[in-house]
Amino acid sequence: MAAASSVSSPPLCLAGRVAIVTGSSRGIGRAIAIHLAELGARVVVNYSTSPVEAEKVATAITTNCSKDAEVAGKSPRVIVVKADISEPSQVKSLFDEAERVFESPVHILVNSAAIADPNHSTISDMSVELFDRIISVNTRGAFICAREAANRLKRGGGGRIILLSTSLVQTLNTNYGSYTASKAAVEAMAKILAKELKGTEITVNCVSPGPVATEMFYTGLSNEIVEKVKSQNLFGRIGETKDIAPVVGFLASDAGEWINGQVIMANGGCLL
C-alpha cells in the first residue's frame, strides 16, 4: 500500500514550467499561484499595489512547496514582480523578468488581476472615470497580457492562457454592470484568440467563478445579501479560493490540453 503522504501530495505535473499569475498577492490569484507551485511550476507572483502581501505568497511557496527531485536545482521557485497590467511596457517587463530569472520561456499565463466597483453602482449612477478604470484593468489588462502571452509563450505543447471571468456574465445581476461588461469582453476575446492560435498548441480558456469569499466579494455587501447568496448555492455556502485554484491547475496541465476556447464555470451549482 502506498504511503499516506504519496496519496495526499499532488503530482508534479507542471515541473519545469514557468507560470505568471497576475493579481496573485491576494484572493483567487493567491490561491492559484500557490497551487501551481504545488504542482511543480516556477511561479511569478505579480502585484500592482500590495508588495507585502505578494512577498507573503512567495514565502508560502518557498516554505511549503515540494522539494522533489523533479524541481530540485531549479532555483528560485518563485519571484515577485510589480506590474500594472493595464500598461503594455510593464507587462512586457513582467515577461522579460520571468524569462531572465528562470532562463526559460513562459509556459502559462493566468490573468487574475481585476478590480470592481466597491459601491455597486447602477449603470445610471456610475462615474465615467470609474467605468474607464474598471475597463482599463479588467479588459484592457487582459488584452495586453493575452497579447504578450500569445507572442511569447512556448509553442508546440504546454502553452496555456487562462483568463479569469465571472458568473455575472450569465446571471446579469443589477449593480454589477461595469464589472460584468468588462468580463464579458474577456470571454469573447479568449474564444477568438483560441482560434487565432490554431496550430501553436497554446490553449486559451476562461474560468468563470461564482461568488468567492474574497475581500473584493464582501466589500459593500450586507450580511443579508451574503446570506441570500449562500442560500442560492447548492452547497449552501460561499465559494472559497481553494475551489477555483484546482480548476486552473487542471487547465494548465497536460491533462487539460483538449479543453480550448471554453468558459469553464466553477460555482458550486448557483447557476445551472
UniProtKB/Swiss-Prot annotation:
Q: Which gene encodes it?
A: ChlADR2
Q: Where in the cell is it found?
A: Plastid, Chloroplast
* Family statement: Belongs to the short-chain dehydrogenases/reductases (SDR) family.
Organism this protein belongs to: Arabidopsis thaliana
Protein name (database record): NADPH-dependent aldehyde reductase 2, chloroplastic
Tell me the GO molecular function terms.
Answer: alcohol dehydrogenase (NADP+) activity
- What's this chain's function? Aldehyde reductase that catalyzes the reduction of the aldehyde carbonyl groups on saturated and alpha,beta-unsaturated aldehydes with more than 5 carbons. No activity on alpha,beta-unsaturated ketones. Can use propionaldehyde, butyraldehyde, methylglyoxal, (e)-2-pentenal, (E)-2-hexenal, (Z)-3-hexenal and (E)-2-nonenal as substrates, but not propenal (acrolein), crotonaldehyde, 2-butanone, 3-buten-2-one or 1-penten-3-one.
**Residue numbers annotated as active site:** 179 (proton acceptor)
Q: Which domain of life is it from?
A: Eukaryota
